[in-house]
């Protein structure tokens, strides 16, 4: 595989990638401070004034790939340069281990290409010896030279239980120097899935998976889908904001509001693929949004941006974040009369007019 990459304005390619990761982190943090529209606002769970269940007996555990997880939460993929990225990943790993959460790491392309691990080495598994950890590579790399060897390296470097392949065509299209070659990705993915000894999860990065795309991915053997719909971190906006070109910024600006909103995408994917393990992420602000997504058919709930500031601070801050999310989800179950997540699937849900 060739490791040739184009540098930008004379900056070495590795340094350019690391700088981009740090800029992504700063801009993602800025987005979290903004109020953004969420598709979850269109849904309302019906309140049950007579729950006939004790709050303390509600069970939030979920079965996933034959394993019972204590909570239905995924720490979704994040990014960052080598110093902050290492700190973020260490804090997330400690919290994931303490709570039994799935930890889905950010893209490992930088580590694979030798520009620094950013905390994505064996230390991660040492900090989280029993938590499910998922490695991560970009789909566009599968038609740019990456194959099963690189996928195995991504898995092995953190002793991962699964591999995420992320789909980010819009981000790449508006990013200076982004990957424009996407023809053949599905076939390359099918080849990889046949050869890799780990299950493969496919996720978008913030613009959603349609039912049609979901069916195509199911057809090549993908083990789970992460909707990652709009309403959360908007990568086209971030790429526009970091661009030095006024023309590029104007191109990116046209895609504000682009994408499939998470709840609608979950609902359509679940109808199209009744048995597919499904993760809802993208714009999940709190436990009530999580309850709506679970009611619509999600099995797990992912958060990235909302966890980011806590992850920069400490493992304890991450634990506090998920304690709040857990308590909100518990109360949503309680106030719909649901003793567990299976009963929540049957709660009354309406669309706001």
Which positions does each model-derived feature cover?
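Metal-dependent enolase-superfamily TIM-barrel catalytic cores that perform enediolate-based chemistry
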Residues: 147-213
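Glycine-rich phosphate/ribose-binding loops and adjacent secondary-structure elements
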Residues: 183-313
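Hydrophobic faces of well-ordered beta-strands that scaffold small-molecule active sites
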Residues: 73-76, 101-106, 133-137, 161, ...
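C-terminal extensions of enzymes
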Residues: 2-29, 295, 301, 307-353
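A gly/proline- and charged-residue-enriched helix-loop-helix capping module
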Residues: 98-139
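An N-cap/entry alpha-helix motif that binds or orients negatively charged groups
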Residues: 1-65, 69
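Conserved, mostly hydrophobic/aromatic
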Residues: 75, 96, 163, 225, ...
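Active-site cofactor/substrate anionic-group-binding motifs, chiefly glycine-
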Residues: 63-114
């Amino acid at each position: 595989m060739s490791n040739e990459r184009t540098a930008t304005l004379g900056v070495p390619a590795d340094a350019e990638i690391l700088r981009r990761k740090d800029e992504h982190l700063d801009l993602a943090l800025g987005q979290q401070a903004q109020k953004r529209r969420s598709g979850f606002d269109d849904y309302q769970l019906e309140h049950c004034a007579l729950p006939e269940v004790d709050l303390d007996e509600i069970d939030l555990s979920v079965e996933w790939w034959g394993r019972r997880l204590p909570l239905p939460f995924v720490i979704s993929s994040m990014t960052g340069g080598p110093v902050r990225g290492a700190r973020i990943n260490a804090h997330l790993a400690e919290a994931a281990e303490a709570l039994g959460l799935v930890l889905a790491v950010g893209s490992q392309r930088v580590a694979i290409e030798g520009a620094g691990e950013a905390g994505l080495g064996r230390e991660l598994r040492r900090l989280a010896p029993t938590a499910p950890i998922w490695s991560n590579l970009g789909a566009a790399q599968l038609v740019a030279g990456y194959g099963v060897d690189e996928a195995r390296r991504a898995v092995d470097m953190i002793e991962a239980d699964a591999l995420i392949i992320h789909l980010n065509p819009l981000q790449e299209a508006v990013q200076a120097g982004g990957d424009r070659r996407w023809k053949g990705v599905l076939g390359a993915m099918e080849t990889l899935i046949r050869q890799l000894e780990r299950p493969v999860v496919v996720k978008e990065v913030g613009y959603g998976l349609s039912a049609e795309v979901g069916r195509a991915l199911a057809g090549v053997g993908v083990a789970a889908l992460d909707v990652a719909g709009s309403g959360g971190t908007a990568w086209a906006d971030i790429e526009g904001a970091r661009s030095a070109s006024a023309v590029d910024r104007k191109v990116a600006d046209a895609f504000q509001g682009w994408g499939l909103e998470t709840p609608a995408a979950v609902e359509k994917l679940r109808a199209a693929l009744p048995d597919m393990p499904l993760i809802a992420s993208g714009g999940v602000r709190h436990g009530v949004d999580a309850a709506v997504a679970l009611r619509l058919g999600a099995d797990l709930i992912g958060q990235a941006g909302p966890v980011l500031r806590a992850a920069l601070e400490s493992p304890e801050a991450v634990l506090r974040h998920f304690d709040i999310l857990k308590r909100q989800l518990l109360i949503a179950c309680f106030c719909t009369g649901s003793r567990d997540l299976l009963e929540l699937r049957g709660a009354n849900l309406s669309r706001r007019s």
